[in-house]
């Protein structure tokens, strides 16, 4: 067993230098000390990547991907991205729209005719920006229609949707975070591509970018992959092993995600206009109590706070993930971990140092 690490944030004790190179040196020294604790513990770990003004200033990892075999984490170790899968799903759908293979304002039911007729007004755009009104299936896993479906997949979910006869609100009138929306987006993308969701991602994005350590849940994981195992108290959510794809279910490595984020910001996955659309909130209403708003696959800061910033975190079993970009401060970072609450304090402090040294720099 391993205990939760508790680390005191003490950035205020160090004066943040004005010179960029000095800030980078301070950041590296500080985060190295943090990650070294994981290596000493010989438990689950973390991988961290930071880019500032187009320069990769940090790309390191610590801890074990697989404790039993003493396999360490490295830049090619794959992690389940959990909800940080959503930006990748949204970018694929946007790319398909820009290629003319689907339209954002088409009804979802056009692509998925098995959907309940009362969902007929829901568009692909509504699904992307969380304004569809479909209740989140994650909140219904204890229902009689879902309980016992161990290994729950997208297809099973479509067949047994608990709330198929109602919506929480009329599409486009409110914003509400729902994993259900991204299950439908994955299925729509599959239909538009004429392939499975994973194959569509691989052919259109992963292979062109050289992302050789990225896949989806349903694909074979034996192709030389070193998977960071999930070290949590349970590998199930309310008694069910989830194998849904789109909102979650994408596995990737630090090196691959860095390729993806750099290509995304350079307009190589979707156009620059597309990235602007994806990082613009459709409604001013917050999607979370903390005030964040939602774009298309991205969580955006509250109004008038950190303009140009977009992020998405993920949490599933022992996996804790985060992808963050900023087109104003030009600070981008990725954090992947497999130790649940054991490593969460470390991730929090790494984020603190990023914000204090780079995002809040003079």
Where are these regions (language model features)?
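A short acidic/small-residue loop/turn micro-motif
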Residues: 63-67, 241, 340-342
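Short, gly/Ser/Thr-rich active-site loops of penicillin-recognizing serine hydrolases
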Residues: 303-305, 340-362
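Short active-site loop at a secondary-structure junction
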Residues: 39-47, 69-126, 167-180, 245-248, ...
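Bacterial N-terminal signal peptides
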Residues: 1-4
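Short, surface-exposed loop or secondary-structure junction motifs
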Residues: 66, 119-317
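Short, conserved catalytic-motif segment at the N-terminal edge
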Residues: 20-81, 103
